[in-house]
């Protein structure tokens, strides 16, 4: 019954459960297990037997909170980009399609930001829970997402300028010469 509850809580917390709650490693010669013998093989603890003690690794809660805080920051950025795209779609200039096009370009970018932040959050939470050594900074993800956002904003700006220029150029040429 307890294992079912632990698995349920672990699935809610976005991590997988481990059958070993203690520090995992080899039984012999692992630094995660403390040996009671002192230098020269003497027993320094005063106990009768030379037993090994399995010491659990402590996980600092600040690590989990920092991971969650990073996830929430990325989600807030993606929600702001999504709101900008929806604003452009709903309240943009109706005479040209440039605002609609800019909104349609930014909407997938915001969804991409959300998906990326969710996968990074789950991966980090799982690695933290499993006590795997890892780098906590993401070197490739933000760079790729910023490049995608920059390209999409550039495309939206180019199409907006092109539509505006095409509209003013075509209206001035279609009116014909004006002689007053």
From Swiss-Prot:
Disruption phenotype: Causes an abnormal morphology of acidocalcisomes, a significant decrease in the amount of polyP and a deficient response to hyposmotic stress.
GO cellular component: acidocalcisome; acidocalcisome membrane
Keyword check for Cytoplasm: no
GO biological-process terms attached to the record: post-transcriptional regulation of gene expression
Membrane-side (Cytoplasmic) residue stretches: 1-70, 122-140
Main location as per UniProt: membrane
Family: Belongs to the VTC1 family.
Known partners and oligomeric status: The VTC core complex is an integral membrane heterooligomer composed of at least the catalytic subunit vtc4 and the accessory subunits vtc1 and vtc2. vtc1 is a small membrane protein without hydrophilic domain. Vtc2 and vtc4 are related and have 2 hydrophilic domains that face the cytosol, an N-terminal SPX domain and the central core domain. The central core in vtc4 is the catalytic domain.
Name listed for the protein in its UniProt record: Vacuolar transporter chaperone complex subunit 1
Gene that specifies this protein: VTC1
